[in-house]
Amino acid sequence: MANLKTKTWNFHMKDYNDLVKKLSQLKPRVSIENLPSSILQVFKKEVNTDYNSVDLTCIDKKLVESLMPFQREGVCYGILKNGRCIIADEMGLGKTIQALGIVHYYRNDWPLLIVSPSSVRYQWSEAIYTFLPSVPTHYVHHYTTAKDTFGDAKIVIMSYDILKRAISSLERHVFGAVIFDESHFLKSPKSARSVAASVVASQARRVVLLSGTPALSRPKELYFQINLVMQKFLGFHEFGIRYCAGTFGKFGWEYGGSSNMQELQLLLNRCCLIRRIKSEVLTQLPSKIREVVILDPKLIKTETQKMKKIAEAVQRESFKNSEGNTALLQHYRETAEVKTKAICNYVNDLLESDTKFLIFAHHLTVLNEICKTISSKNVSYIRIDGSTKSEERKVRCDVFQEQDDCLVAVLSITAASTGITLTAAQRVVFAELYWNPGILCQAEDRVHRIGQQGSVLIQFLIAKNTADDHLWKLMQTKLNVLNKAGLGQNFAVEKSTEAKRGNETPSNQSNLLSFFTKASVQQDSAAHREKIEDVHQLLEEDDDALITLNLDGLDEDC
């Protein structure tokens, strides 16, 4: 079959021998390069690709019901590969829930080890509590130091840094199933973390790797990851010659290039790797996917005397009086200080992915530390805050939009939430929360605008036992009022790392305001006008008085 676009011919594998035989008659006018016998064997082998043949009823019902169609296919793919696979879906497509579905299917092989960057360890436990409610909470253990013990835990979660330091313990403790999150952390086979990962994977029956950036353009970096799930894959030299444009140089063989990439992608999909990009599944995705990221509590010092006193004051005072306002504002400022280290740790891990993102914060100290972190990695970024002149904003936005190496936009929540377009990114990170959900929605829409071709991932970085606990509830209270009117900001977020998947309607302030300004014989006009003013304030203002709004009456009418 001819493909006019690519100017290539496609033949069925069963016709391979006949094709080679007939082409051989054209020598020497035609040069023929046969497929290596090991590759031929892979393609000729019968492979079950019938996803409908997989019975998912043994997986927790909550998880199965939360799967989008393409995620269900991902779970089935992993099961058809006997729980040894690489899920390489693009960022924001829900690799976590797919991995949990696969390993829960094989829970008889547990204990399960989950290895991830330190900044997202607690996202995993939150996802387990949400999507696998049948798993008792005491089954889950965060392994936080090399001297820690596994005990009777059925699910152990640790960072890559701990993995390499705990190798002696891991050699003695067999995990039947392993998940390596952000597996591009294992691209170098000689690194200490990769050596430890190899030890763990060699003992496990089920191994699932997750990576939104699987280095398909740099196949050399992918080889070790493939070997973790397929230990009888091609030898490295054979792989390097075929797919890394291997050449013999001055200092020996070099495998820094890429070759036969279309063949490699077909081979990997047949063997162990499934990858979907947003454009392929866009019809199944909401326009915005929101998720909560629980920051590493080990990096957040909430036990100081100062934080305890402020937290007690917030608990004691009502938000309807000035004392309560002052206490919460002070708590908000202190939270910025104590969560900054954890925020920067998360930013460090995001930079590993080499993809563009926006990060919003409110306090200058947080913005400054984020910028220092990015600079320390020699990554190009822009910053827009209250001190940025209007003409300079456009210049900086153009840099972010047009220059591929400019990966991060560091933005002030209040100063950069309107009037700019940054659609080159598909991820928005809120390092801090804010009183007004309307402001956050406006900030999100710097990416989610006309010209954005994909679904946008929105992440909220939450520090437990800080002002975030109160601010999140405060935001939800305000949003519940709007949602009851059927005209909310669509800010629904699951209590986990995986966003609530569903159809979303873009927020529309004009519709909301017109709803409340319509005449109604059932409403007292004076009281109604007062509530209209409250709604204006709710959506538009961002001063300290926002937290004093009395929404009870409005709530009842809605």
Model-derived features: positions:
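Conserved Walker A/P-loop ATP-binding site and its immediately adjacent core
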Residues: Q98, D109-T130, L216-E221, H362-T365
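Conserved helicase ATPase core of P-loop NTP-dependent helicases/translocases
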Residues: K356-F360, N368-E369, S375-A416
